[in-house]
Amino acid sequence: MKIALIAHDRKKTLMIKLATAYKHILEKHELYATGTTGMKVMEATGLPVHCFKSGPLGGDQQIGAMISEDNIDLVIFLRDPLSAQPHEPDVTALIRLSDVYEIPLATNIGSAEILLRGVEAGFADFREVIHEGDRRPLAF
Protein backbone atom coordinates (compact mmCIF):
# COMPACT_ATOMS: atom_id res chain seq x y z
CA MET A 1 0.00 0.00 0.00
CA LYS A 2 0.96 3.60 -0.50
CA ILE A 3 0.46 5.50 2.74
CA ALA A 4 0.57 9.29 3.10
CA LEU A 5 1.68 10.83 6.40
CA ILE A 6 0.86 14.45 7.17
CA ALA A 7 0.97 16.29 10.50
CA HIS A 8 0.41 19.88 11.49
CA ASP A 9 3.26 21.41 13.50
CA ARG A 10 1.73 20.75 16.92
CA LYS A 11 1.07 17.11 15.93
CA LYS A 12 4.48 16.21 14.49
CA THR A 13 5.75 14.71 17.76
CA LEU A 14 2.63 12.56 17.90
CA MET A 15 3.23 11.42 14.29
CA ILE A 16 6.78 10.41 15.21
CA LYS A 17 5.47 8.39 18.16
CA LEU A 18 2.88 6.75 15.90
CA ALA A 19 5.45 5.90 13.23
CA THR A 20 7.82 4.51 15.85
CA ALA A 21 5.13 2.40 17.51
CA TYR A 22 3.86 1.03 14.20
CA LYS A 23 7.17 0.81 12.37
CA HIS A 24 6.65 -2.95 11.98
CA ILE A 25 3.55 -2.19 9.88
CA LEU A 26 4.76 0.91 8.05
CA GLU A 27 8.01 -0.73 6.90
CA LYS A 28 5.99 -3.07 4.67
CA HIS A 29 4.49 -0.20 2.68
CA GLU A 30 5.51 2.78 0.54
CA LEU A 31 5.46 5.96 2.59
CA TYR A 32 4.84 9.47 1.32
CA ALA A 33 4.74 12.63 3.42
CA THR A 34 4.80 16.38 3.41
CA GLY A 35 8.33 17.74 3.82
CA THR A 36 8.98 18.33 7.50
CA THR A 37 6.80 15.45 8.65
CA GLY A 38 8.57 13.04 6.32
CA MET A 39 12.03 14.17 7.38
CA LYS A 40 11.18 13.82 11.06
CA VAL A 41 9.69 10.34 10.55
CA MET A 42 12.78 9.23 8.60
CA GLU A 43 15.15 10.58 11.26
CA ALA A 44 13.23 8.95 14.11
CA THR A 45 12.53 5.56 12.52
CA GLY A 46 14.97 5.02 9.67
CA LEU A 47 12.01 4.25 7.39
CA PRO A 48 12.29 5.41 3.77
CA VAL A 49 9.79 8.20 3.08
CA HIS A 50 9.22 10.05 -0.18
CA CYS A 51 9.02 13.68 0.94
CA PHE A 52 7.00 16.29 -0.90
CA LYS A 53 7.09 20.01 -0.16
CA SER A 54 5.99 21.33 3.20
CA GLY A 55 2.19 21.54 3.53
CA PRO A 56 1.93 25.35 3.29
CA LEU A 57 4.25 25.29 0.25
CA GLY A 58 2.11 22.84 -1.71
CA GLY A 59 2.84 19.45 -0.15
CA ASP A 60 -0.82 18.85 0.71
CA GLN A 61 -1.71 19.57 -2.91
CA GLN A 62 0.99 17.21 -4.16
CA ILE A 63 -0.46 14.40 -2.06
CA GLY A 64 -3.94 15.41 -3.23
CA ALA A 65 -2.76 15.02 -6.83
CA MET A 66 -1.55 11.51 -6.04
CA ILE A 67 -4.93 10.70 -4.52
CA SER A 68 -6.71 11.93 -7.65
CA GLU A 69 -4.51 9.64 -9.75
CA ASP A 70 -5.30 6.70 -7.42
CA ASN A 71 -1.68 6.54 -6.27
CA ILE A 72 -2.35 6.76 -2.52
CA ASP A 73 -4.19 4.04 -0.62
CA LEU A 74 -4.42 5.49 2.88
CA VAL A 75 -3.91 8.92 4.46
CA ILE A 76 -2.92 9.63 8.04
CA PHE A 77 -3.33 13.36 8.59
CA LEU A 78 -2.83 14.38 12.20
CA ARG A 79 -4.56 17.75 12.16
CA ASP A 80 -4.46 20.46 14.78
CA PRO A 81 -8.11 21.55 14.99
CA LEU A 82 -7.32 24.23 17.58
CA SER A 83 -4.91 26.29 15.45
CA ALA A 84 -5.63 28.29 12.32
CA GLN A 85 -3.72 26.99 9.30
CA PRO A 86 -2.60 29.35 6.52
CA HIS A 87 -3.25 26.61 3.97
CA GLU A 88 -6.67 25.52 5.30
CA PRO A 89 -8.21 25.42 1.78
CA ASP A 90 -5.54 22.88 0.79
CA VAL A 91 -6.37 20.80 3.87
CA THR A 92 -10.07 20.88 3.02
CA ALA A 93 -9.32 19.89 -0.59
CA LEU A 94 -7.19 16.94 0.54
CA ILE A 95 -9.95 15.67 2.82
CA ARG A 96 -12.51 16.12 0.04
CA LEU A 97 -10.35 14.18 -2.45
CA SER A 98 -9.96 11.35 0.06
CA ASP A 99 -13.75 11.13 0.22
CA VAL A 100 -14.23 11.42 -3.56
CA TYR A 101 -11.74 8.62 -4.27
CA GLU A 102 -12.77 6.43 -1.29
CA ILE A 103 -9.36 6.67 0.39
CA PRO A 104 -9.32 5.73 4.10
CA LEU A 105 -8.41 8.86 6.08
CA ALA A 106 -7.42 9.23 9.73
CA THR A 107 -7.33 12.74 11.18
CA ASN A 108 -6.43 11.87 14.76
CA ILE A 109 -4.30 9.35 16.62
CA GLY A 110 -7.24 7.10 17.54
CA SER A 111 -8.43 6.61 13.98
CA ALA A 112 -4.82 6.33 12.76
CA GLU A 113 -4.16 3.41 15.10
CA ILE A 114 -7.33 1.65 14.01
CA LEU A 115 -6.47 2.08 10.32
CA LEU A 116 -2.91 0.83 10.79
CA ARG A 117 -4.08 -2.20 12.74
CA GLY A 118 -6.65 -2.80 9.99
CA VAL A 119 -3.91 -2.67 7.37
CA GLU A 120 -1.89 -5.18 9.39
CA ALA A 121 -4.90 -7.51 9.63
CA GLY A 122 -5.62 -7.27 5.90
CA PHE A 123 -8.81 -5.25 6.25
CA ALA A 124 -7.66 -2.77 3.59
CA ASP A 125 -7.07 -5.37 0.89
CA PHE A 126 -9.97 -3.91 -1.10
CA ARG A 127 -7.49 -1.26 -2.31
CA GLU A 128 -5.51 -4.04 -4.02
CA VAL A 129 -8.66 -5.18 -5.80
CA ILE A 130 -9.20 -1.63 -7.03
CA HIS A 131 -5.65 -1.50 -8.38
CA GLU A 132 -6.17 -4.77 -10.26
CA GLY A 133 -9.36 -3.59 -11.96
CA ASP A 134 -11.06 -0.35 -12.76
CA ARG A 135 -9.13 2.70 -11.50
CA ARG A 136 -12.19 4.92 -11.07
CA PRO A 137 -13.70 5.81 -7.68
CA LEU A 138 -15.96 3.15 -6.22
CA ALA A 139 -19.67 3.51 -6.93
CA PHE A 140 -22.06 1.96 -4.47
Swiss-Prot record:
GO terms for molecular function: methylglyoxal synthase activity. Residues 1-140 form the MGS-like domain. GO terms for cellular component: cytosol. Its EC number is 4.2.3.3. It comes from the Bacteria. NCBIfam families: MGSA (TIGR00160), PRK05234.1 (NF003559). One of its GO terms (biological process) is methylglyoxal biosynthetic process. Belongs to the methylglyoxal synthase family. Keywords: Lyase. Catalyzes the formation of methylglyoxal from dihydroxyacetone phosphate. This is Methylglyoxal synthase. It catalyses: dihydroxyacetone phosphate = methylglyoxal + phosphate. The keyword Manganese does not apply. The gene is mgsA.
